[in-house]
Amino acid sequence: MNRRDVLRIGLAAPIAAAGFAQRGRATTPRPTIMTVAGPITPDALGPMLTHEHVLVDFAPLAERTAEPTTARYDPDEVFDVVLPHLQALRPHGCRAMAEFTPAYLGRDPALLRRLSAASGLHLLTNTGFYGARNDQHLPPFVFTETADALAARWVREWTDGIDGTGIRPGFIKIGVDGGPLSDVDRKLVRAAARTHRRTGLTIAAHTGPAVPAFEQLEVLAEEGISASAWIWTHAQNEHDPAHHVAAARRGAWVAFDGVAPASLERHVALVRTMKDHDLLDRVLLSQDAGWYHVGEPGGGDIRPFTFFFTDFLPALRAAGLTEADLTQLTVTNPARAFTVQVRTR
């Protein structure tokens, strides 16, 4: 993306904190997106990568203590390794990133706040629990507590901040396995729905195939929550585009978030299909890149974030997407998806 592209996509939006109308008259909350540095207005977000990672710790839960923990890694080292990758995004026009590492997998809001300040990027963190990978990253209490009790934990992070940092989540991150929803997966979805109703935070669900995706939509419907409050994460792992179209028509956000050199052509085709069905307004895009791997020397092989801008956006242009389409996908849709707003049926 060259300088002309940067200006065209509208990257000069000022950073503004969300607030309220003057006292003495009816107060209406401004639309808000919650970053690790505090609230901003949606028009301040700018072009966004909607699903990336700064670090992850896949060690078994028994080897780690309660979140956040720096016992297994040096935050200063992670900062030094990751910061150049974030700084490399700014010349390409990127201004924001949703960081998807959940609790009990290395979520570190304080580190993200440092990286945000140093890089100039808006970073979002999350609340919620990750039930994918056969539940191995769920703390034991998840299996015994009710959905309401889990929701209360997540709501507390919204009202009080995460683990004493004062940093509030910008979305709800849950994970489910790739088959029909298990009992604990279903509980996580209900807890997320109830958290959304009390906070307005959007639900991003690590999902993949269509079967658990549509089962989640049914749970949300039972809870009275609109599909527009839910992001189908890793939707590219469902190979029948008809399911993407069906979910988008129900109002869900469909996230094609595995953009990489090996998957570029597939992601272009998926986006083109959604354009052909006039559904680009329900699509989110990202790479699932980065990944300082705790336990590997120097964090292992960090995948740069810039491929999205250097290769993927030009490939979308070559496939017939217009500049208005790209603005929709990189600016308008992310701002709408991550705006804090209760969305009921």
What is the meaning of each model-derived region?
Residues M1-L7:
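Twin-arginine (Tat) signal peptide motif
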Residues L7-Q22, P31-G38, T306-R345:
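Mid-to-C-terminal alpha-helical segments outside catalytic/metal-binding sites
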Residues G46-T50, E63-H122, D148-I167:
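Alpha-helical scaffold segments that flank or form the walls of functional sites
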Residues H51, M97, H196, V254, ...:
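Divalent metal-coordination and catalytic microenvironments
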Residues F58-A62, P109, D135, A213-V219, ...:
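Histidine/acidic-residue-rich catalytic or RNA/ligand-binding cores of hydrolases
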Residues R95, R114-A117, H122-T202, W253, ...:
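Active-site gating/metal-coordination segments in enzymes
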Residues A193, R197-D276, V283:
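Catalytic pocket-lining loop regions of alpha/beta-barrel enzymes
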Residues A204, D257-G258, L279-I302:
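Short acidic/histidine-rich active-site segments
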